């Protein structure tokens, strides 16, 4: 099981500036961190136009991602990388690689990085809450990025256990900052199909691809294990502050798909008030996570009852709740 690992940050600079001298692409490679997430800002958040941060890729138990920004060719930019799990903050300034004046850059116009490999396809699972509540609709999503303006037409075919299905919705393509398109197809699925481990396949056709790309996803294989849920009061050391933390510890569950939310005196709490860690693999292959609810100390002192609700497929009726409040005295 992977330990918390801080990322390394490397600048990515084009080796030549386009001779019109207008725009160029700079980037930062954030490599070898665990767990998710990291945040990447440019110029401390002042630079938002022309930014494209790609999804993280998991390799050998560690995540990596790339963030790119398009700026005027005379400009440098600083990427600000934060990895909360390891309390790491790294600022890396990226500037174009200058060639000596007597020998100006004579390489052909730098191809934009998105065109090197053509379109890429990613498939995403349904949200755990959607698969566990009959009143909600679980959806598998297929996303195609780096679709060129020359070949913008994208077709999707969906399969459930290799049988074609026709109820997907393809959304209108969206133009990205770098003049490529992003296209998304969403397949509503049956709760039981996901929970029983059926395979969902998205097949993508585009003339810029030498052959269709297929991506498959299914629930993690293995025997489900029921989570144990414990609520923890604020630490005595924290009670001198105006805000205190009520914690929900959820352990011993498998697979990692889980949903946690809170209520205060039976009223649902806004998601802004609590933070969940990602599920973390434990030594025995099960998962655990913490959920931290921040509350006013005055509300805690008044005996407000806080309830941690956990949804997981191994639970009876897919849900369990644990309540906590200040003990009298």
Curated annotation (Swiss-Prot):
- Per the UniProt entry, the disulfide pairs are 28-79, 142-202, 248-308
Where can this protein be found?
A: Secreted
Asked if the keyword Secreted belongs to this entry, the reply reads yes
Q: Keywords on this record? A: Disulfide bond, Glycoprotein, Immunoglobulin domain, Secreted
Q: List glycan-bearing residues.
A: 178
Keyword Secreted in the entry? The reply is yes
Q: In the UniProt record, which is one GO cellular component term?
A: extracellular region
Leader sequence range is: none
Something else known: This chain was isolated from pooled serum of strain 13 inbred guinea pigs.
Q: What is this protein called?
A: Ig gamma-2 chain C region
Q: What is the lineage of its organism?
A: Eukaryota, Metazoa, Chordata, Craniata, Vertebrata
């Amino acid at each position: 099981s992977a330990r918390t690992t801080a990322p390394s940050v490397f600048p990515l600079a084009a080796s030549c500036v386009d001779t019109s001298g207008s725009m160029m692409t700079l980037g930062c490679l954030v490599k070898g961190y665990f767990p998710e997430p990291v945040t990447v800002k440019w110029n401390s958040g002042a630079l938002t136009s022309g930014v494209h941060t790609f999804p993280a890729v998991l390799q050998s138990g560690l995540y990596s991602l790339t963030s790119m920004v398009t700026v005027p060719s005379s400009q440098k930019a600083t990427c600000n990388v934060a990895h909360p799990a390891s309390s790491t903050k790294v600022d890396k300034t990226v500037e174009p690689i200058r060639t000596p004046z007597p020998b100006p850059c004579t390489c052909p116009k730098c191809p934009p990085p998105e065109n090197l490999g053509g379109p890429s396809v990613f498939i995403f699972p349904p949200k755990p809450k959607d698969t566990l509540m009959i009143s909600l609709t679980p959806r598998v999503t297929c996303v195609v990025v780096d679709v060129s303006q020359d070949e913008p037409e994208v077709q999707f075919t969906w399969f459930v256990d290799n049988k074609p299905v026709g109820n997907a919705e393809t959304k209108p393509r969206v133009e990205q900052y770098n003049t490529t398109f992003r296209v998304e197809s969403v397949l509503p699925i049956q709760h039981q199909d996901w929970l029983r481990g059926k395979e969902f396949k998205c097949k993508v056709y585009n003339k810029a691809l030498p052959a269709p790309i297929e991506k498959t996803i299914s629930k993690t294989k293995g025997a489900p294990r029921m989570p144990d849920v414990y609520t923890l009061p604020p630490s005595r050391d924290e009670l001198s502050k105006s805000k205190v933390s009520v914690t929900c510890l959820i352990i011993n569950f498998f697979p990692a798909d889980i949903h946690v939310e809170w209520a205060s005196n039976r009223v649902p709490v806004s998601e802004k008030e609590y933070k969940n860690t990602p599920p973390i693999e434990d030594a025995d292959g099960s998962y655990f996570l913490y959920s931290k609810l921040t509350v006013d100390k005055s509300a805690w002192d008044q005996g407000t009852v806080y309830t941690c609700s956990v949804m997981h497929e191994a639970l009876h009726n897919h849900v369990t709740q644990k309540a906590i409040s200040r003990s009298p005295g």
